[in-house]
């Protein structure tokens, strides 16, 4: 067993609960879970808060919602507030529209070293496929899955 560092996952969100839902579902499917997840909310409407509250009822780790009022784009400010609330030694930061591969957190923690910054690339999903993904709640994709653009970034 690998001695993983403790970990906080931080992600921003703003008025796109459908994308946040897929992100949170992908967290629940991780082979190694973060110790907590913090959502940095840049002033989203009430539907985002309600979605987070629904997930909090059954989420496998603490799910913390850090919100501030919507006064134009203040993503850096809300991210700083969210990171300040992190309780664990290692922070993984992802964008709010990311659907993580189930090994994402495990891979991050496997290669975590003090003084080292890890980053990765992402593939894009064709916009025309988003309604289907939001309907089916699909969160796992193969290299040849339909609608994946820039798939060679995964190599």
Q: Whereabouts are the PLM-identified features?
A:
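Conserved donor NDP-sugar-binding/catalytic core segment of glycosyltransferases
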Residues: 103-136
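Short, acidic, metal-binding catalytic loop of nucleotide-sugar glycosyltransferases
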Residues: 25-34
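Cell-envelope/extracellular polymer assembly enzymes that use nucleotide-activated donors
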Residues: 5-8, 36
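A conserved acidic beta->alpha catalytic loop
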Residues: 41-50, 72
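Glycine-rich, basic loop-to-helix element that forms the pyrophosphate-binding segment
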Residues: 69-86, 103
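Conserved short acidic donor-positioning loop in nucleotide-sugar-dependent glycosyltransferases
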Residues: 15, 27, 42-43, 70
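Short beta-strand/loop segment that forms part of the nucleotide-sugar
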Residues: 34-43, 64-68
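Short aromatic/hydrophobic "clamp" motif used to bind/position activated sugar donors
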Residues: 91
């Amino acid at each position: 067993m690998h001695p993983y560092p403790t970990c906080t996952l931080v992600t921003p969100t703003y008025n796109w609960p459908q994308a946040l839902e897929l992100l949170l579902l992908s967290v629940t499917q991780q082979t190694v879970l973060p110790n907590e997840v913090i959502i940095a909310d840049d002033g989203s409407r009430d539907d985002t808060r309600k979605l987070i509250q629904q997930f909090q009822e059954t989420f496998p780790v603490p799910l913390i919602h850090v919100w501030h009022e919507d006064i134009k784009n203040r993503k850096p400010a809300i991210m700083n507030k969210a990171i300040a609330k992190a309780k664990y030694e290692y922070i993984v930061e992802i964008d709010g529209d990311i659907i993580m591969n189930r090994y994402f957190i495990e891979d991050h923690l496997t290669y975590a070293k003090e003084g080292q910054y890890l980053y990765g690339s992402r593939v894009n999903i064709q916009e025309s496929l988003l309604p289907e993904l939001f309907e089916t709640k699909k969160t796992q994709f193969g290299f040849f899955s339909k609608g994946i653009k820039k798939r060679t970034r995964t190599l």
